[in-house]
A protein has these predicted regions:
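Residue-level signal for secondary-structure boundary sites
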Residues: 146, 169-171, 208-210
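Oligomerization/assembly interface segments of phage tail-like spikes and tubes
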Residues: 125-145, 194-208
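Solvent-exposed edge beta-strands and adjacent loop segments
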Residues: 44-133, 178-193
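Aromatic-patch recognition
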Residues: 118, 146, 163, 173-174
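Mixed-charge, glycine-accented linear interaction segment located at domain edges/termini
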Residues: 178-234
Length: 234
């Protein structure tokens, strides 16, 4: 009986030795796309950079602000476990929609002096609890009653900001329950050559260093800089 068991063991060992070299080349010949398809949902992927591609910094001098209680739907990022891929993980799907009976029918357009819009996301927290402090700042010139009224209202109103980088990618700051809070700071200047106006600094806590909008918003239409497109005739 022992000899019979020993013989079976030897045969299995020989079969295994023969099979391993056959399987190894099959695995090595899988290309990157195929290997990526084997993983479901977000996973670490190479960060590549094409030499010579544009990388101009800065943001456009226009933004949108939405008070947190104004819309009934908001662009949101998916649950991390349900994101289809890495790009979807940091992409807010959906649009702002406002109730018919509400005060606001669309986002509030904000002008900012050229080259004054700034955004950064700094790491915060301790090990096993790292997140980001998103900070958005911009400058509105002047000393008008309308501006000071906006300052009075926005200082204690949480909400969402939409802004656009130099590559025309729109980003959103604030998510349901993790709204952006705004601190306005007015400076009237001292000398005649000084520029007067309000600097706005908005901050929000987030698990992401940036969130992009899946559906861009036409800021020029909202700002009244161009007419809204005519609906197609059915």
């Amino acid at each position: 009986m022992k000899k019979y068991t020993y013989l079976i063991f030897c045969l299995l060992f020989v079969a295994l030795v023969i099979a391993i070299p056959e399987l190894h080349p099959q695995t090595c010949h899988l290309d990157g796309d195929t290997l990526t398809m084997l993983a479901a949902g977000p996973a670490f992927a190479p960060l590549k950079w094409n030499v010579g591609q544009n990388n101009m910094g800065g943001y456009k001098g226009r933004l949108l602000f939405v008070p947190f209680d104004a819309p009934n739907t908001v662009p949101t990022v998916p649950d991390p476990g349900k994101a289809a891929d890495n790009e979807a993980l940091v992409t807010a799907a959906g649009t702002f929609a406002f109730p018919a009976e509400g005060t606001y029918k669309q986002p509030i357009y904000l002008y900012s002096t050229d080259a004054t819009v700034d955004y950064k996301a700094e790491q915060q927290g301790e090990a096993d609890g790292i997140s980001y402090k998103q900070t958005l700042s911009f400058f509105f010139p002047g000393n008008t009653p309308e501006m000071h009224a906006f300052n009075a209202l926005v200082k204690n109103t949480a909400g969402y900001y939409v802004f656009e980088d130099s590559d025309r990618r729109q980003m959103i700051m604030g998510q349901p329950g993790l709204y952006a809070s705004t601190a306005p700071s007015f400076n009237g200047g001292k000398a005649r050559s000084d520029r007067r106006g309000t600097t706005y600094t908005a901050t929000a806590d987030s698990n992401y260093s940036a969130i992009f909008l899946e559906t861009p918003i036409d800021m020029e239409v909202i700002g009244g800089l161009k007419p809204a497109p005519t609906p197609p005739i059915e």
